């Protein structure tokens, strides 16, 4: 009965709210395709190509109900088992081609990336901002990507270690005390704080920080809702909060310009780089980025920095908790650094984070196992041939990262959590936790730094206990343990810390 009620609920939700949002988008895809079938030898050649195998399901709805009524990973895995590494389906009214091989992922994301553009529903672009870099291709995207990469390069991250460490320390201190809390929610707060310090440096006042946090949380709650602008709906509230974010960011930018004098003002952080960045206009003139462009990219970076990283951090805590021997080995590695820093009296350094070999392997294996980004969306900008199959113009194309990460051909015994597999680098294009190509996540090193610092602080100064069942997974929209992994956290006494440190290191060296 519970399953029946769940199925009825999902069916009603999809038919009444989700599907209509995508029908207009995908109707235009079919129209463009009809126009593009004008003929000539090229079209006759493409007509002879086969579409990939697969099922398109029911008209308009496609196989959306099958996807949403079961674990999406089971859905995609069963499709691959039946049809192979390239197959078609119809989701939310959109025809899609799924690709589950490293070669196909590289084809779409790297070698032939010009034939596939990033695609997002218009409601998502409105929420984040149409000028955010990951909605674009071409010169504008490359210019902004270079700027973001410069702000997140090793030299820049080296200076951020104390700020990241302080954010981690504050998050764990607020959580400790033995009360039950959602790990995911605690990690979201941490990731937001790290995102803020990355964008604004140490220059953001408490008022602006809290205003950003409050309004961003409203935007986040409405991001995945049906785009209904009726007053009182989550989406309408999110749109209003997004407008307030724009006003807050304009105020921050204006204050910086007033302090910084001419030009773009700013500073050495990401916001300063955005304020100094110049954009080539249509007439070839050079102009500073507008306040709208700056705001869109700040919100975009906050969005990219929070939920995905928080999800991985949550899984790391679970995997370590469920692997006691591995946890002891990680403690030994981190306690050696802790003792070298005189029991935490000296600050953690960038060089020390580079020496955390086992912890880094744990992070990589957590990224593989959890596969937070299970797939990515692209859209074919032309009819494309791949391995004898036709990918029609306008169809959605989805490289399935999770299927690749869990393929025993590339990772032996893929359902086993085994960090030692990363003692050897994986084969090219088989490990894609941050995507690949020009649209790969530019903040991957920042995310890994946050994870390394969190593990260091956690295992050297705290102990934790998971409360309740943690094997079920929920999608919100990224996979996390059910309920966000409820857990208790306790601070260890300083004397106990040093005793454990000496004992752990001695045992590890025996």
Curated annotation (Swiss-Prot):
Top class in the EC scheme: oxidoreductase
Alphabetized Pfam families for the sequence: p450
Membrane association type: Single-pass membrane protein
Catalyzed chemical reaction(s): 2-cis-(+)-abscisate + reduced [NADPH--hemoprotein reductase] + O2 = (+)-8'-hydroxyabscisate + oxidized [NADPH--hemoprotein reductase] + H2O + H(+)
Pathway this chain belongs to: Plant hormone degradation; abscisic acid degradation
Any one Gene Ontology BP term: abscisic acid catabolic process
Induction cue: Not induced by ethylene treatment or flooding.
SS bond list: none
Location(s) in or outside the cell: Membrane
The keyword Oxidoreductase appears for this protein: yes
GO molecular function, one term: iron ion binding
Gene3D superfamilies, sorted: Cytochrome P450
Cofactors named for this entry: heme
Any one annotated GO CC term: membrane
Transmembrane segments: 3-23
Binding site for heme: 441
Keyword ATP-binding among UniProt keywords: no
Keyword annotations: Heme, Iron, Membrane, Metal-binding, Monooxygenase, Oxidoreductase, Transmembrane, Transmembrane helix
Domain of life: Eukaryota
Enzyme Commission number(s) of this protein: 1.14.14.137
Similarity field: Belongs to the cytochrome P450 family.
Task of the protein: Involved in the oxidative degradation of abscisic acid.
Name the record gives this protein: Abscisic acid 8'-hydroxylase 2
Organism: Oryza sativa subsp. japonica
